[in-house]
Amino acid sequence: MASNTLMSCGIPAVCPSFLSSTKSKFAAAMPVYVGATNFMSRFSMSADWMPGQPRPSYLDGSAPGDFGFDSLGLGEVPANLERYKESELIHCRWAMLAVPGIIVPEALGLGNWVKAQEWAAIPGGQATYLGQPVPWGTLPTILAIEFLAIAFVEHQRSMEKDSEKKKYPGGAFDPLGYSKDPAKFEELKVKEIKNGRLALLAIVGFCVQQSAYLGTGPLENLATHLADPWHNNIGDVIIPKGIFPN
Protein backbone atom coordinates (compact mmCIF):
# COMPACT_ATOMS: atom_id res chain seq x y z
CA MET A 1 0.00 0.00 0.00
CA ALA A 2 2.80 2.36 0.90
CA SER A 3 4.59 1.57 -2.33
CA ASN A 4 1.43 2.15 -4.38
CA THR A 5 0.96 5.51 -2.69
CA LEU A 6 4.55 6.53 -3.39
CA MET A 7 4.34 5.44 -7.03
CA SER A 8 1.14 7.41 -7.49
CA CYS A 9 3.14 10.48 -6.41
CA GLY A 10 5.73 9.90 -9.11
CA ILE A 11 8.36 8.12 -6.99
CA PRO A 12 10.02 5.32 -9.04
CA ALA A 13 9.96 1.65 -8.29
CA VAL A 14 13.09 1.90 -6.18
CA CYS A 15 10.91 2.74 -3.20
CA PRO A 16 9.40 -0.76 -2.74
CA SER A 17 12.89 -2.28 -2.74
CA PHE A 18 13.97 0.36 -0.25
CA LEU A 19 11.13 -0.73 2.02
CA SER A 20 12.16 -4.38 1.68
CA SER A 21 14.73 -5.96 3.96
CA THR A 22 17.24 -7.21 1.35
CA LYS A 23 19.99 -5.03 -0.07
CA SER A 24 20.20 -7.14 -3.22
CA LYS A 25 16.63 -6.25 -4.14
CA PHE A 26 17.44 -2.59 -3.63
CA ALA A 27 20.38 -2.79 -6.02
CA ALA A 28 18.46 -4.80 -8.60
CA ALA A 29 15.45 -2.53 -8.56
CA MET A 30 17.40 0.73 -8.85
CA PRO A 31 15.86 2.51 -11.88
CA VAL A 32 17.32 5.31 -13.97
CA TYR A 33 15.01 7.83 -15.54
CA VAL A 34 15.59 8.25 -19.25
CA GLY A 35 14.80 11.92 -18.86
CA ALA A 36 17.38 12.23 -16.08
CA THR A 37 20.12 10.70 -18.22
CA ASN A 38 19.25 13.01 -21.09
CA PHE A 39 19.43 15.96 -18.72
CA MET A 40 22.85 14.90 -17.43
CA SER A 41 24.05 14.41 -20.98
CA ARG A 42 22.93 17.90 -21.92
CA PHE A 43 24.52 19.27 -18.76
CA SER A 44 27.86 17.59 -19.41
CA MET A 45 27.94 18.97 -22.95
CA SER A 46 27.21 22.49 -21.74
CA ALA A 47 30.07 24.93 -22.16
CA ASP A 48 31.69 25.78 -18.81
CA TRP A 49 32.26 29.42 -19.75
CA MET A 50 28.53 30.02 -20.32
CA PRO A 51 26.03 27.64 -18.67
CA GLY A 52 23.37 26.57 -21.15
CA GLN A 53 25.53 27.18 -24.20
CA PRO A 54 26.38 24.04 -26.20
CA ARG A 55 29.98 22.89 -26.12
CA PRO A 56 31.58 22.47 -29.57
CA SER A 57 32.19 18.81 -30.38
CA TYR A 58 35.89 19.42 -31.01
CA LEU A 59 36.38 20.96 -27.55
CA ASP A 60 35.99 17.87 -25.39
CA GLY A 61 37.61 19.30 -22.27
CA SER A 62 40.79 17.25 -22.62
CA ALA A 63 43.05 20.25 -23.22
CA PRO A 64 44.22 22.32 -20.22
CA GLY A 65 41.92 25.28 -19.66
CA ASP A 66 39.32 24.06 -22.18
CA PHE A 67 36.01 25.62 -21.13
CA GLY A 68 34.25 25.14 -24.45
CA PHE A 69 34.74 28.71 -25.67
CA ASP A 70 35.17 29.15 -29.43
CA SER A 71 32.46 31.55 -30.55
CA LEU A 72 34.09 32.04 -33.98
CA GLY A 73 34.62 28.34 -34.65
CA LEU A 74 38.36 28.81 -35.16
CA GLY A 75 39.20 25.31 -33.95
CA GLU A 76 36.89 23.31 -36.20
CA VAL A 77 39.84 22.10 -38.30
CA PRO A 78 41.94 19.74 -36.10
CA ALA A 79 45.27 20.98 -37.50
CA ASN A 80 44.27 24.58 -36.83
CA LEU A 81 43.13 23.71 -33.30
CA GLU A 82 46.53 22.24 -32.43
CA ARG A 83 48.26 25.29 -33.84
CA TYR A 84 46.02 27.64 -31.86
CA LYS A 85 46.67 25.70 -28.65
CA GLU A 86 50.40 26.01 -29.19
CA SER A 87 50.23 29.70 -30.14
CA GLU A 88 48.08 30.57 -27.14
CA LEU A 89 50.46 28.84 -24.75
CA ILE A 90 53.56 30.51 -26.21
CA HIS A 91 51.93 33.95 -26.13
CA CYS A 92 50.78 33.30 -22.55
CA ARG A 93 54.37 32.60 -21.52
CA TRP A 94 55.63 35.76 -23.20
CA ALA A 95 52.87 37.77 -21.52
CA MET A 96 53.76 36.33 -18.11
CA LEU A 97 57.34 37.51 -18.67
CA ALA A 98 56.25 40.90 -19.99
CA VAL A 99 53.90 41.82 -17.13
CA PRO A 100 56.55 41.75 -14.36
CA GLY A 101 59.01 43.26 -16.85
CA ILE A 102 56.66 46.23 -17.17
CA ILE A 103 55.63 46.56 -13.52
CA VAL A 104 58.90 45.93 -11.66
CA PRO A 105 61.01 48.73 -13.24
CA GLU A 106 58.21 51.22 -12.65
CA ALA A 107 57.82 50.02 -9.06
CA LEU A 108 61.57 50.46 -8.52
CA GLY A 109 61.36 54.03 -9.81
CA LEU A 110 63.47 53.41 -12.91
CA GLY A 111 60.75 54.53 -15.30
CA ASN A 112 57.77 53.11 -17.14
CA TRP A 113 57.79 50.76 -20.11
CA VAL A 114 56.57 53.40 -22.56
CA LYS A 115 59.67 55.53 -22.00
CA ALA A 116 62.13 52.65 -21.71
CA GLN A 117 64.27 54.06 -24.50
CA GLU A 118 64.87 57.12 -22.33
CA TRP A 119 66.01 55.40 -19.14
CA ALA A 120 67.30 52.02 -20.35
CA ALA A 121 70.20 53.61 -22.26
CA ILE A 122 72.63 56.39 -21.55
CA PRO A 123 73.62 58.97 -24.20
CA GLY A 124 75.29 57.34 -27.15
CA GLY A 125 73.01 54.30 -27.05
CA GLN A 126 75.03 52.36 -24.44
CA ALA A 127 72.72 49.77 -22.88
CA THR A 128 72.23 49.70 -19.12
CA TYR A 129 70.91 47.16 -16.66
CA LEU A 130 69.43 48.51 -13.42
CA GLY A 131 71.22 51.77 -14.15
CA GLN A 132 74.64 50.20 -14.78
CA PRO A 133 76.24 50.28 -18.26
CA VAL A 134 76.31 46.95 -20.06
CA PRO A 135 79.84 46.44 -21.43
CA TRP A 136 79.04 44.40 -24.51
CA GLY A 137 77.08 46.78 -26.67
CA THR A 138 74.39 49.22 -27.50
CA LEU A 139 70.65 48.56 -27.41
CA PRO A 140 70.45 47.79 -31.16
CA THR A 141 73.27 45.25 -30.77
CA ILE A 142 71.54 43.52 -27.87
CA LEU A 143 68.23 43.48 -29.75
CA ALA A 144 69.94 41.86 -32.75
CA ILE A 145 71.51 39.19 -30.53
CA GLU A 146 68.16 38.47 -28.88
CA PHE A 147 66.43 38.27 -32.25
CA LEU A 148 68.90 35.71 -33.61
CA ALA A 149 68.87 33.66 -30.40
CA ILE A 150 65.07 33.51 -30.22
CA ALA A 151 64.79 32.76 -33.94
CA PHE A 152 67.13 29.78 -33.49
CA VAL A 153 65.17 28.43 -30.52
CA GLU A 154 61.82 28.88 -32.28
CA HIS A 155 63.15 27.13 -35.39
CA GLN A 156 64.28 24.17 -33.29
CA ARG A 157 60.88 24.01 -31.61
CA SER A 158 59.03 24.15 -34.93
CA MET A 159 60.98 21.10 -36.15
CA GLU A 160 59.55 18.96 -33.34
CA LYS A 161 56.94 16.51 -34.65
CA ASP A 162 55.31 15.72 -31.31
CA SER A 163 52.69 18.42 -30.65
CA GLU A 164 52.91 17.91 -26.88
CA LYS A 165 56.70 18.30 -26.83
CA LYS A 166 56.32 21.50 -28.81
CA LYS A 167 54.30 22.92 -25.94
CA TYR A 168 55.97 21.13 -23.03
CA PRO A 169 59.54 20.21 -24.03
CA GLY A 170 60.63 19.16 -20.54
CA GLY A 171 64.27 18.27 -19.99
CA ALA A 172 66.35 21.39 -19.36
CA PHE A 173 63.14 23.44 -19.44
CA ASP A 174 61.85 21.54 -16.39
CA PRO A 175 64.80 21.71 -13.96
CA LEU A 176 62.57 21.09 -10.93
CA GLY A 177 61.03 17.96 -12.43
CA TYR A 178 57.40 19.08 -12.22
CA SER A 179 56.44 16.85 -15.16
CA LYS A 180 57.51 13.64 -13.39
CA ASP A 181 54.21 13.45 -11.50
CA PRO A 182 51.47 13.11 -14.19
CA ALA A 183 48.63 14.28 -11.94
CA LYS A 184 50.60 17.28 -10.68
CA PHE A 185 51.74 18.05 -14.22
CA GLU A 186 48.15 18.22 -15.49
CA GLU A 187 47.24 20.53 -12.62
CA LEU A 188 50.17 22.82 -13.41
CA LYS A 189 49.18 22.93 -17.08
CA VAL A 190 45.78 24.35 -16.11
CA LYS A 191 47.35 26.85 -13.72
CA GLU A 192 49.81 27.97 -16.39
CA ILE A 193 47.17 28.59 -19.05
CA LYS A 194 44.89 30.42 -16.59
CA ASN A 195 47.66 32.71 -15.37
CA GLY A 196 48.82 33.19 -18.95
CA ARG A 197 45.38 34.30 -20.09
CA LEU A 198 45.24 36.73 -17.18
CA ALA A 199 48.64 38.10 -18.24
CA LEU A 200 47.40 38.54 -21.82
CA LEU A 201 44.46 40.58 -20.53
CA ALA A 202 46.85 42.62 -18.40
CA ILE A 203 48.98 43.44 -21.46
CA VAL A 204 45.87 44.58 -23.32
CA GLY A 205 44.97 46.74 -20.33
CA PHE A 206 48.45 48.28 -20.24
CA CYS A 207 48.24 49.15 -23.93
CA VAL A 208 44.74 50.63 -23.65
CA GLN A 209 45.75 52.73 -20.64
CA GLN A 210 48.84 54.02 -22.41
CA SER A 211 46.85 54.93 -25.52
CA ALA A 212 44.34 56.84 -23.39
CA TYR A 213 46.97 58.54 -21.22
CA LEU A 214 50.08 58.87 -23.38
CA GLY A 215 53.43 58.29 -21.75
CA THR A 216 52.06 56.77 -18.54
CA GLY A 217 52.66 53.35 -17.03
CA PRO A 218 50.17 51.02 -15.30
CA LEU A 219 51.26 51.89 -11.75
CA GLU A 220 51.01 55.61 -12.46
CA ASN A 221 47.54 55.06 -13.89
CA LEU A 222 46.57 53.02 -10.84
CA ALA A 223 47.78 55.72 -8.45
CA THR A 224 45.90 58.38 -10.41
CA HIS A 225 42.71 56.32 -10.28
CA LEU A 226 42.99 55.63 -6.54
CA ALA A 227 43.56 59.33 -5.85
CA ASP A 228 40.21 60.25 -7.43
CA PRO A 229 38.24 57.15 -8.51
CA TRP A 230 35.12 59.15 -9.36
CA HIS A 231 36.82 61.22 -12.05
CA ASN A 232 39.86 59.16 -13.06
CA ASN A 233 38.35 56.05 -14.62
CA ILE A 234 37.44 54.59 -17.99
CA GLY A 235 34.42 56.88 -18.19
CA ASP A 236 36.77 59.85 -18.18
CA VAL A 237 38.06 58.61 -21.53
CA ILE A 238 35.00 57.25 -23.34
CA ILE A 239 32.37 59.75 -22.15
CA PRO A 240 32.57 63.25 -23.70
CA LYS A 241 33.53 65.92 -21.19
CA GLY A 242 30.49 68.03 -22.07
CA ILE A 243 28.04 65.42 -20.75
CA PHE A 244 29.46 65.17 -17.24
CA PRO A 245 31.67 68.22 -16.66
CA ASN A 246 33.97 68.14 -13.63
Curated annotation (Swiss-Prot):
Keyword Electron transport attached: no
Amino-acid positions noted as binding chlorophyll b 2 in the UniProt annotation, renumbered to this chain: R93, V134
Annotated InterPro entries: Chloro_AB-bd_pln, Chloroa_b-bind
Residues annotated to bind chlorophyll a 3: L130, E192
Predominant location: plastid
Binding site for chlorophyll a 2: H91
UniProt name for this protein: Chlorophyll a-b binding protein 6A, chloroplastic
Organism: Solanum lycopersicum (Tomato)
Record gene name: CAB6A
